[in-house]
Regions:
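Membrane-embedded transport module
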Residues: 1-3, 8, 12, 16-214, ...
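Generic detection of intrinsically disordered/low-complexity segments and helix-coil linkers/edges
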Residues: 96, 126-127, 250-251, 256, ...
């Protein structure tokens, strides 16, 4: 990947030929700026553009790709599982309008907000340790292994959701002349869809590093939008006659709430165990950077600025020592360069902080 940077008209071919073009506002006109992907006011801003915003955007884009495949697999696989029960007759599990709005409305807002606003590590930490930029070179956020792990997780979640819902609803068979006491096809479908929508928000929440009121509004707004759409269509006979009165039946049924609670709980535990294991056994630079942002260093709680300053000062003074085994109390003494780490004395850090 090449980057071209210039400030004049003679730099336009170079900027357009490079994979990423950066134009600088200068005295030679706006041709370079108008032809570039990014524009900056001074050459000195290039460092922040690449190290901070470049890394943030790379991480957001990788997360966008993983999540888009995840949420589509989560909605498609239950339909595929249902095909075995329907003898592959072509019968859809989900009501058409709900299914079409799944991607464009019910799960779109949070990933858009996260793709624009999320920041895993503060600019000060990134600029203090430029090695964070190696995350892109080493494909820390997206490679084949990570992609297929997300697909495997989507498959496991889909199995839990579909078969939990199917077990809770039962077969719904009754004799001739008897009144139906079971839930029908679209009741099962909307139950399954509700769980998928809610847990997709929960799954993305696990990846949100910078949770703000905007993200909280987008998460809650997506779920609220689904419920409003469900209420509207199930009470509008001309629009959704197949699911007319659907919400009145489903929301009052025990199988709906049981399958919702247990499915989300089991899926949540699987994701939580995976994330916790990754943080404890194989922390990434992003994990360590967030710990430093929180003021934790070598198992001790310092102020945020004190922890970052102590780690930066000691890393410059000590150089890069050879790697050695981590302990649970030494996670944040690991330096972020090539698997090596810097051992920082607790006494020295506390003395310096005081």
């Amino acid at each position: 990947v090449t980057l071209g940077i210039g400030d004049g008209a003679n730099d336009v071919p170079m900027i357009q030929t490079a994979h990423v073009g950066v134009g600088i506002h200068g005295l030679e006109g706006q041709q370079a700026v108008n032809s570039s992907d990014f524009s900056i006011g001074q050459f000195a801003f290039l460092r922040r553009l690449m190290l901070v915003h470049g890394r943030w955007n790379y991480r957001r884009l990788c997360l966008l790709v993983k999540y888009m495949f995840y949420k589509n697999a989560a909605i498609v696989l239950p339909q595929w599982f249902f095909g075995f029960r329907a003898l592959f007759s072509g019968q859809a599990l989900f009501f058409d309008y709900f299914y079409q709005l799944y991607n464009v409305a019910f799960t779109a807002l949070p990933i858009i907000g996260l793709g624009v606003l999320d920041q895993d590590v503060s600019p000060k930490i990134i600029e203090s340790f430029p090695v964070f930029y190696r995350d892109g070179l080493e494909r820390v956020f997206l490679d084949r292994k990570i992609f297929w792990s997300w697909m495997l997780e989507a498959g496991i979640h889909s199995v839990i959701i579909f078969f939990m819902v199917a077990a809770a609803h039962g077969e719904g068979v009754w004799g001739a002349g008897e009144e139906s006491t079971g839930l029908g096809l679209y009741e099962m479908g909307t139950t399954c869809l509700t769980i998928v929508i809610i847990f997709c928000q929960i799954r993305l929440f696990f990846e949100t590093s910078n949770f703000t009121w905007i993200m909280a509004l987008l998460y809650s707004g997506s779920i609220f939008l689904w419920w409003m759409c469900w209420i509207t269509i199930s009470n509008w006979v001309d629009l959704g006659y197949l699911v007319y009165g659907n919400i009145d039946v489903v929301a009052r049924s025990g199988p709906f709430w049981l399958s919702l609670i247990f499915s989300c709980t089991f899926c949540f535990m699987i994701t939580l165990i995976r994330q916790s294991t990754e943080v404890m056994l194989a922390p990434t630079r992003s994990h360590i950077g967030r710990e430093v942002m929180a003021g934790h260093l070598d198992g001790e709680k310092l102020g945020r600025e004190q922890a970052a300053a102590a780690l930066a000062e000691q890393s410059q003074a000590s150089g890069f020592g050879r790697a050695r085994a981590k302990s649970s109390k030494e996670v944040l003494t690991e330096m972020l360069v090539g698997g090596n780490m810097v051992r920082v004395s607790s006494q020295k850090r506390l003395a310096g902080a005081q």
